[in-house]
Amino acid sequence: MNIQALLSEKVRQAMIAAGAPADCEPQVRQSAKVQFGDYQANGMMAVAKKLGMAPRQLAEQVLTHLDLNGIASKVEIAGPGFINIFLDPAFLAEHVQQALASDRLGVATPEKQTIVVDYSAPNVAKEMHVGHLRSTIIGDAAVRTLEFLGHKVIRANHVGDWGTQFGMLIAWLEKQQQENAGEMELADLEGFYRDAKKHYDEDEEFAERARNYVVKLQSGDEYFREMWRKLVDITMTQNQITYDRLNVTLTRDDVMGESLYNPMLPGIVADLKAKGLAVESEGATVVFLDEFKNKEGEPMGVIIQKKDGGYLYTTTDIACAKYRYETLHADRVLYYIDSRQHQHLMQAWAIVRKAGYVPESVPLEHHMFGMMLGKDGKPFKTRAGGTVKLADLLDEALERARRLVAEKNPDMPADGLEKLANAVGIGAVKYADLSKNRTTDYIFDWDNMLAFEGNTAPYMQYAYTRVLSVFRKAEIDEEQLAAAPVIIREDREAQLAARLLQFEETLTVVAREGTPHVMCAYLYDLAGLFSGFYEHCPILSAENEEVRNSRLKLAQLTAKTLKLGLDTLGIETVERM
């Protein structure tokens, strides 16, 4: 149930009846304060100006045409022309009942789209580090939300599995006679990478061999392809362990590495030349873009093929966008890549559009994100100044959570404690990131993220168990409760019910904007409203069974909404804490 969409359409029709143009925007928003009702229509200002009327005068005319019978108990004009809408308790009660009767909590299914989501993208032969965390978990929250809404989502893990480094690695593996490459762990491989790089930089004969191996690999030589596949397999096997620990939905089947697009690159360069978009410049093949200017104010040149015949990331990204539209039949493509790549993507997509590879009707969206910083406000590093491995970060999260939950549950059996510590520790790391607006940098702080108060995973997980405890104490007859009506008489009941029914609106924003922090803020607010409701509206000691059952149903929908909301974020819930 999307109340905002329902009210927007009703207000829009009333505005048109009052003389507003057909494309008018009612600007219906959830009210910021209780005294302004549940929703507020703010669109009168802009429209009244066009009509040469006072906004309040237009609002009065709109009210004469606005039929919210059975939806609102009160509609009033406030200030210069805002329309405040107070939802009818009977309307709220009816839709709470409907939400409880549905597995989807009454959330409608929009028109189905095929949506490609590009996220995570680690490099082969390197261990995942904290820099991969944001793309992986923000992208996964978007995927879960879109799939819940009913879209066909194609996960695209654009791993860095191609390039000159592979000649270097294969040459070094061969030199070390590493026949057991498939059994190596990634930690070994990282050491190999460092040693290979050192030799590549210092030993010209080795470097020449590595360069030859790249050519052989790129020409499809089976021995070199097999060695390359081993490196990819070792990497992705190790990465899958991290994905599983993080409770993200990526699998080996979602790998669509850079190598996938290699066969397309010569054809793309030839096609861009044929279309007059690419030209030769100082031996390289370049596309000049009027939309981007260099320091001299001239169109910026984007190289798509180097003088030596090699291709660039831009060429791969052009091929990638083309493939996602032509082969995967994407209606929409989302890229969870950090903000530093923005200009690079915009240039690649400008070429894609000019070449006609992806029509304007298919959005290519860069859902960029900021950096994860240490308490000193600088990029998050180890004490020695090195890159923090993601596996080490998760180990520390688990260790800290173990201490925390053991302190609070001294009598819990070891296996239960481990399961709880895992849910709390991993949940804390993910939620601390997801609860921040992705476009900003954020400070990584263990104490804050593991706190049991504030907008944190432990608080949300605890809030969920608190609602469940009401049911354990109530010893409910499920069938009897299902048949009981919902009655809303108290203000706190109405506020909780209205917020519960805003779940679909929240999902819609997350799906549209790729902003999981909006879901975190909604769930945190919901938990706070439930807390106030629980305190002021006795459930188990209610004045009669009818009120008790009605309040139990509000509690039941709260539990289901918290669980489902946290699930769209990839945060595990627990039954007891």
Curated annotation (Swiss-Prot):
<dbReference type="InterPro" id="IPR008909">
    <property type="entry name" value="DALR_anticod-bd"/>
</dbReference>
<dbReference type="GO" id="GO:0006420">
    <property type="term" value="P:arginyl-tRNA aminoacylation"/>
</dbReference>
<comment type="subunit">
    <text>Monomer.</text>
</comment>
<protein>
    <recommendedName>
        <fullName>Arginine--tRNA ligase</fullName>
        <ecNumber>6.1.1.19</ecNumber>
    </recommendedName>
</protein>
<dbReference type="InterPro" id="IPR035684">
    <property type="entry name" value="ArgRS_core"/>
</dbReference>
<dbReference type="InterPro" id="IPR036695">
    <property type="entry name" value="Arg-tRNA-synth_N_sf"/>
</dbReference>
<keyword id="KW-0547">Nucleotide-binding</keyword>
<dbReference type="GO" id="GO:0004814">
    <property type="term" value="F:arginine-tRNA ligase activity"/>
</dbReference>
<dbReference type="InterPro" id="IPR001412">
    <property type="entry name" value="aa-tRNA-synth_I_CS"/>
</dbReference>
<comment type="similarity">
    <text>Belongs to the class-I aminoacyl-tRNA synthetase family.</text>
</comment>
<dbReference type="Pfam" id="PF05746">
    <property type="entry name" value="DALR_1"/>
</dbReference>
<dbReference type="InterPro" id="IPR005148">
    <property type="entry name" value="Arg-tRNA-synth_N"/>
</dbReference>
<keyword id="KW-0648">Protein biosynthesis</keyword>
<dbReference type="InterPro" id="IPR001278">
    <property type="entry name" value="Arg-tRNA-ligase"/>
</dbReference>
<dbReference type="Pfam" id="PF00750">
    <property type="entry name" value="tRNA-synt_1d"/>
</dbReference>
<keyword id="KW-0067">ATP-binding</keyword>
<dbReference type="Pfam" id="PF03485">
    <property type="entry name" value="Arg_tRNA_synt_N"/>
</dbReference>
<dbReference type="GO" id="GO:0005524">
    <property type="term" value="F:ATP binding"/>
</dbReference>
<keyword id="KW-0963">Cytoplasm</keyword>
<dbReference type="InterPro" id="IPR014729">
    <property type="entry name" value="Rossmann-like_a/b/a_fold"/>
</dbReference>
<keyword id="KW-0030">Aminoacyl-tRNA synthetase</keyword>
<keyword id="KW-0436">Ligase</keyword>
<feature type="short sequence motif" description="'HIGH' region">
    <location>
        <begin position="122"/>
        <end position="132"/>
    </location>
</feature>
<dbReference type="InterPro" id="IPR009080">
    <property type="entry name" value="tRNAsynth_Ia_anticodon-bd"/>
</dbReference>
<dbReference type="GO" id="GO:0005737">
    <property type="term" value="C:cytoplasm"/>
</dbReference>
